[in-house]
């Protein structure tokens, strides 16, 4: 099996056409990133309906071939994006989904690989860190070619809330959320900047994490999914846009730094766990994990998050 590959047709296979999968497909068409997009779902009628609906808007978008297919269509895909699985219910944590979705994923990944697929797999289903690890184990693909969406959405939420608070363009806010995509995630205050200026200069204190407004912003970030689920039942637009961003970094060989779920192998002193960290993403998947110089408290938070993920993973998947 190759450790590197050259994109062939810019073909993407989407497994799961629920809220996230269909939103991802719609976003892909609007941004014109791929040439081919195949929608795969156990409910073939649903996949067919989504493909037809999106195709009818093609005169307003960049030309792209979209159809409802089967796992055999993964054979020559550059990227397989998995959004299928049980959804997070109100009051349910992402980790509560483990047992249900591990079983689903074992079947999905085997079907993808049995097609002859030899590209990159991007996992979006929760708990994403654990399911990315399951995907890597079952697929046998090189570590860097199995990526979880990780904390890309949490980081985007964090940057948006900071930009709203300080009244600046969110594209000029540089700050990361690391760790589990879930309750043990944490903000990397020590590297938060606005326009190249450290965040502490905007609030006149070095103890950012103790500043009430900043703590509230992080809590809003961490708990955002719960608030959205309680109001509309599910989150899908934001994560779909995040998945498209990762897709673009892969297909366009961008070498972009994004907070994805990647397998740590000694980085940050942690091994054998997929977790949200900044990483360089290009046509081969994860090119390199960026090791930030964390404060002792931030390092402790990352280790705690990794420990929780390992414990939960080991109970559900060995």
Swiss-Prot record:
InterPro entries per record: L-lactate/malate_DH, L-lactate_DH, L-lactate_DH_AS, Lactate/malate_DH_C, Lactate/malate_DH_N, Lactate_DH/Glyco_Ohase_4_C, NAD(P)-bd_dom_sf
Swiss-Prot/TrEMBL keywords: Allosteric enzyme, Cytoplasm, NAD, Oxidoreductase, Phosphoprotein
Phosphotyrosine: modified positions: 226
Gene3D superfamilies, per database record: Lactate dehydrogenase/glycoside hydrolase, family 4, C-terminal, NAD(P)-binding Rossmann-like Domain
EC number of the protein: 1.1.1.27
Pathway terms, separated by semicolons: Fermentation; pyruvate fermentation to lactate; (S)-lactate from pyruvate: step 1/1
Entry's Gene Ontology BP terms: glycolytic process; lactate metabolic process
Cellular location(s): Cytoplasm
Similarity-based family: Belongs to the LDH/MDH superfamily. LDH family.
Quaternary structure note: Homotetramer.
Molecular function GO terms recorded: L-lactate dehydrogenase activity
GO cellular component annotations of the record: cytoplasm
Main subcellular localisation: cytoplasm
Binding-site residues for substrate, renumbered to this chain: 88, 94, 126-129, 154-157, 235
Keyword Metal-binding: no
Reactions mediated catalytically: (S)-lactate + NAD(+) = pyruvate + NADH + H(+)
Function of the molecule: Catalyzes the conversion of lactate to pyruvate.
Protein name: L-lactate dehydrogenase
Oxidoreductase listed as a keyword: yes
PROSITE patterns: L_LDH (PS00064)
Activity regulation description: Allosterically activated by fructose 1,6-bisphosphate (FBP).
HAMAP family from the UniProt entry: Lactate_dehydrog (MF_00488)
Binding, beta-D-fructose 1,6-bisphosphate: 159, 174
Positions of NAD(+) binding: 20, 41, 46, 71, 85-86, 124-126, 149
